[in-house]
Amino acid sequence: MKNTTLYTYRDYFVIRGGKPLTGKVKISGAKNAALPIMFATILTEEPCTITNVPDLLDVRNTLLLLRELGAELEFLNNTVFINPSINSFITNQEIIRRMRASVLSLGPLLGRFGRAVVGLPGGCSIGARPIDQHLKFFKEAGADVEVREGYVYVNLKEKRRVHFKFDLVTVTGTENALLYLASVPEESILENIALEPEVMDLIEVLKKMGAHVKVEGRSAYVKGSENLKGFTHSVIPDRIEAGTFMVGAVLTDGEILLENARINHLRAVVEKLKLIGGEVVEENGNLRVFRKESLRACDIETQVYPGFPTDMQAQFMALLSVAKGKSRIKENIFEHRFHHAQELNRLGANITVRGNTAYVEGVERLYGSEVYSTDLRASASLVLAGLVAQGETVVRDVYHLDRGYEKLEEKLKKLGADIERVSEL
């Protein structure tokens, strides 16, 4: 694995606000598509090549996990080459605890070996993020499931067709089920599945491997194979990174050309951005984003895709904190996902949280201060706020950002931001 500098947990950003973001930026591949696709390689014994893979902590931890399981791999210039000579069904607990997506090893390990031992996952601390739907599916598939001492033990008696309906829409639950069912020769049915672009990207990979997958509404019909093939695939662009830069353009009153962004993945974000005062124009496959009118209040409610994404809620809160009027943001996907509200208030925002709703009264300006990141998207909102805050803003614990944004400060610098990463050894 070709090495690039991995940042430390003590890194922080120093931002001097007041400069508009102008220029062009290339959007990286989607982490949330890359991770399940990398786990899909467990299902085959043939070589796999994945391009447009972002160089992030979660990606590197996934590669470490695959290597621990026996895979031979190389990560070079955003391309992953994997020879999945997997010889173990027991995952490394230390790696597992670093990221929530590690639970996606369950499905393919069970598909390949008929059993799996996976540590309970880590990642962002956003309320309750249980894996009960994953385990319920595996039980329905005929597996014995036991959770003890921080591990999930899954043993399969025999592979059989499954007809399973999720109690709620879950992205990783859908992906785990698809990864397992790709190895089951009989046709299975999943109901109430997630339809996120990242899920659809995984389905495209499973089709390349030899599985037959048909999606109708929120149902998926899956007929797998016990001889899945290797594949070559390019990961879709990161719609959340694109959305973050879109907010940055409108918030700072700049103008950004987003390369490698797909507007069809961003309809709900574009709709709200325009209501607030932004403009998004398609140009030769790219997106030009700028502020068209004075910022105004807007109500937002997070929903499963194709609704407004929970992963853009924090960034829009930063934007609405300086928009004229009173806005209401209702969070329906995760509980306790308003930690950034308190930190934005340190910068002078006027935000009140009641239950799963935040009430944002726009202020004339924000002022620099020291703030602390609590999760990936909260970190992004604080950086965005720092870009327009008067004076100097220090954003602590930016290791959260390194889990989901590739070279964020470098991209912001190229757009004109005054931002510096400081490492405390």
UniProtKB/Swiss-Prot annotation:
The keyword Membrane does not apply. One of its GO terms (biological process) is UDP-N-acetylgalactosamine biosynthetic process. GO terms for cellular component: cytoplasm. Transmembrane segments: none annotated. Pfam families: EPSP_synthase. Its main location: cytoplasm. Phosphoenolpyruvate binds at K31, N32. InterPro entries: Enolpyruvate_Tfrase_dom, Enolpyruvate_Tfrase_sf, MurA_subfamily, RNA3'P_cycl/enolpyr_Trfase_a/b, UDP_GlcNAc_COvinyl_MurA. It is found in: Cytoplasm. This is UDP-N-acetylglucosamine 1-carboxyvinyltransferase. The gene is murA.
